[in-house]
């Protein structure tokens, strides 16, 4: 009896050591858009995604930003387009209106829209792309040209999925080949 109790205690302790104490339910990959701006004007500017649905989830604190540049982004609301970060989305969206240290703008999380326009607001005024862009891949990289006010380059679905396929196929074949050689 004592032996069974000791075995049970050891099993319970092992289970407690192996099982994590906290669970991370939201740890999977999230869709993302990275935008590189070329030919940008000198000085501070903001870049945001314009979406067709107004939202009630505040994605930024307006007190941290220049009100004049924010107003340039919000002026598109009269045309039925709403700034995703500056105006809010129905679900959370992460990003920043200012460029990151590497000069890119990154938007991610569940609030990332499938179709959007790019809007920029700078010291000389605001502008937005004429046509909406529709994401076709999970991680999208865009190049936005300030002078032409257009998206000049986007991630190719064939290239993206081709690289993803090869990056999983080659290691899988190498591991399976190694196992076949070892146990063959």
Can you say where each PLM-predicted feature lies in the sequence?
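Short, aromatic-rich amphipathic segments at membrane interfaces
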Residues: 128-165
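Positively charged n-region of N-terminal signal peptides that target proteins for export
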Residues: 1-7
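Sec-dependent signal peptide cleavage junction
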Residues: 18-29
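Bacterial N-terminal signal peptides
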Residues: 8-17
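A short, solvent-exposed beta-strand micro-motif common in secreted/extracellular proteins
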Residues: 114-121
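Tryptophan-paired
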Residues: 65-110
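Core alpha-helical transmembrane segments of integral membrane proteins
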Residues: 160-184
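A short, amphipathic beta-strand motif
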Residues: 31-39
């Amino acid at each position: 009896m004592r032996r069974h109790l000791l075995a049970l205690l050891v099993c319970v302790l092992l289970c407690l050591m192996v099982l994590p104490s906290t669970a991370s339910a939201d740890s999977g990959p999230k869709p993302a858009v990275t935008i590189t701006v070329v030919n940008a004007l000198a000085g501070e500017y903001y870049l945001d995604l314009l979406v067709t649905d107004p939202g009630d989830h505040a994605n930024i604190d307006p007190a941290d930003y220049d009100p004049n540049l924010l107003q340039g982004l919000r002026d598109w609301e009269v045309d039925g387009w709403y700034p995703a970060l500056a105006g809010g989305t129905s679900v959370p969206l992460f990003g920043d209106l200012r460029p990151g240290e590497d000069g890119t703008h990154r938007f991610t999380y569940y609030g990332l829209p499938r179709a959007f326009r790019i809007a920029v607001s700078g010291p000389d005024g605001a502008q937005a792309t004429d046509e909406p862009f529709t994401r076709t891949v999970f991680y999208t990289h865009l190049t936005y040209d300030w002078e032409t006010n257009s998206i000049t380059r986007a991630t190719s679905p064939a290239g993206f999925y081709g690289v993803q396929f090869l990056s999983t196929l080659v290691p899988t074949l190498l591991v399976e080949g190694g196992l076949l050689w070892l146990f063959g």
